[in-house]
């Protein structure tokens, strides 16, 4: 080698934490975790479930679920957006596309009655992901449910039923809804 050091400067052991299965939505890469406890505080204060906590002290501290429990909440996908270092990522769609490849579109959430603003990210006119939007008047980010975050997968599925059928005396016919 012509440039740089030929031997390591870091001789201590590196901290290795095994990844945990905390549910079907959130994937963990716990070696990235910096113990900011944003996910713990979000689960307790906003989602209302105390499924995630910090265990141990000092160098041996870890964030995980109690007794290998699953983090189940309607708002559990929001910890993906809260994590500053990417220790908590989306399990159904991890690193599918780069953000600069996607077209951003502001929209209103159709799955709840609150009119929550969401951001749709499109590629080739197909929805790739849905993230919470913010209100322009207050610049406040909203929380979205897991149903909102992942509902586009079923909406644009080729197996989705598009037409209604009416079954009269063993004879099926199209039902006009207009």
Predicted features along the sequence, with ranges:
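N-terminal export/assembly segments and adjacent metallocofactor-ligating motifs
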Residues: 1-178
């Amino acid at each position: 080698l012509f440039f740089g050091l030929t031997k390591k400067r870091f001789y201590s052991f590196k901290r290795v934490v095994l990844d945990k299965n905390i549910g079907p939505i959130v994937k963990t890469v716990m070696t990235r975790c910096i113990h900011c406890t944003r996910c713990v505080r979000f689960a307790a204060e906003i989602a209302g479930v105390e499924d995630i906590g910090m265990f141990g002290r000092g160098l041996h501290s870890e964030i995980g679920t109690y007794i290998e429990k699953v983090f189940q909440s309607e708002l559990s996908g929001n910890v993906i957006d809260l994590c500053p270092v990417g220790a908590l990522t989306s399990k159904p769609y991890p690193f599918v596309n780069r953000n600069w490849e996607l077209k951003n579109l502001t929209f209103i959430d159709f799955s709840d009655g609150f009119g929550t603003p969401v951001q749709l990210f499109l590629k080739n006119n197909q929805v790739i992901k849905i993230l919470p939007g913010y209100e322009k008047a207050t610049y406040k980010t909203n929380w979205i449910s897991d149903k909102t975050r992942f509902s586009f997968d079923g909406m644009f599925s080729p197996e989705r039923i598009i037409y209604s059928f009416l079954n009269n005396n063993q004879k099926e016919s199209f039902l006009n809804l207009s």
